């Protein structure tokens, strides 16, 4: 069964288009290289966002977690963002 991780982020500054482009060009490929099959970054407010990462299964997601922790640390530093929360689980229904 597929496995999803969701992380919620906040920053003191409004994210610029340049920041969003950097995330698209740099961080999404890093997450995929860690094992994700797909990644979406969602702007949830002017100063908040979330990252949804899809994995083939829980084993793949678990194997990626050390690398994901490094990527999250780098994103926090590069964008002066704070990781607010992170959640994960197996997909129980899909359409």
Where are these regions (language model features)?
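Short S/T/G/P-rich N-terminal loop/turn motif that feeds into the first structured element of a domain
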Residues: 1-50, 54-70, 77-95
């Amino acid at each position: 069964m597929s496995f999803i991780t969701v992380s919620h982020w906040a920053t003191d500054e409004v994210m610029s288009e340049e920041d969003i482009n950097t995330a698209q060009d740099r961080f999404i490929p890093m997450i995929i290289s860690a094992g994700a099959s797909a990644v979406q970054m969602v702007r949830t407010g002017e100063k908040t966002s979330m990252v949804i990462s899809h994995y083939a299964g829980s084993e793949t997601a678990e194997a990626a977690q050390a690398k994901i922790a490094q990527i999250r640390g780098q994103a926090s530093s590069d964008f002066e963002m704070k990781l607010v929360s992170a959640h994960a689980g197996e997909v129980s229904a899909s359409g």
